Regions:
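Glycine-rich FAD pyrophosphate-binding loop
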Residues: 10-37
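N-terminal Rossmann-fold NAD(P) dinucleotide-binding loop
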Residues: 4-5
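Dinucleotide-binding Rossmann-like beta1-alpha1 core, especially the glycine-rich loop
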Residues: 37-113
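Active-site/ligand-binding neighborhood in enzyme catalytic cores
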Residues: 78-82, 89-178
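Short glycine-/small-residue-rich flexible loop motifs, especially phosphate/cofactor-binding loops
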Residues: 8, 57-58, 124
């Protein structure tokens, strides 16, 4: 993958002999792309490079030309479009709230109504992070399908990496370079 490629490049630069072995029939791991009808297609799903380090950005640009891309996905729930990651645009569409304080109050209210004080599973953790409404519409079905089991059977830590922002920024990553 990317780590192995960087390691091999740096070792070679330092005068070492390198042999890159990959268990797949190609190098690059999960970031591997192949050309299909003139288009670079990610074989293993999109992987978006992002960093806030100017040094890292300059380093990787020695080897490839990058296209500027801002990942700002949306979710379609029965014809209703919601911004991801969950942010003030999502909260405004869901509840009509305008300020971060209003959104936080709504989430706290739904968390309290659900009786959650110490989240024990993914469902409880998700409700603690974004409220019952967003959990029911945008997390429950998708996550259950993704993992092949109900959210109540999944550990809470899985959802903790989910970005939740109390700004109107639809950018999935906070990184300067994408």
């Amino acid at each position: 993958g990317l780590y192995g490629a960087v390691f091999a490049q740096e070792a070679k630069k330092a005068g070492k002999t390198c042999l890159v072995i990959d268990k797949r029939g190609h190098i690059a791991g999960n970031i591997y792309t192949e050309e299909v009808e003139g288009i670079q297609v990610h074989r293993y799903g999109a992987h978006i490079f992002h960093t806030s380090s100017k040094a890292v950005w300059q380093y990787v640009n020695q080897f490839a030309e990058f296209n500027r891309y801002t990942n700002s996905p949306v979710a379609n729930y029965h014809g209703e479009i919601y911004n991801l990651p969950f942010n003030m645009n999502t909260f405004n569409k869901m509840w009509g709230v305008v300020t971060p304080a209003e959104a936080k109050a709504k989430i706290e209210e739904q968390k309290r109504e659900a009786g959650i004080t110490d989240p024990k599973n993914l469902e409880e953790q998700a409700i603690s992070l974004v409220g019952t409404d967003i959990y029911e519409k945008l997390i429950k079905g998708y996550t259950g399908k993704q993992w092949g089991r109900p959210c109540t059977e999944l550990p809470a830590f899985i959802i903790k990496r989910l970005p939740v922002r109390f700004t109107y920024d639809n950018n999935y990553f906070n990184a300067l370079y994408q």
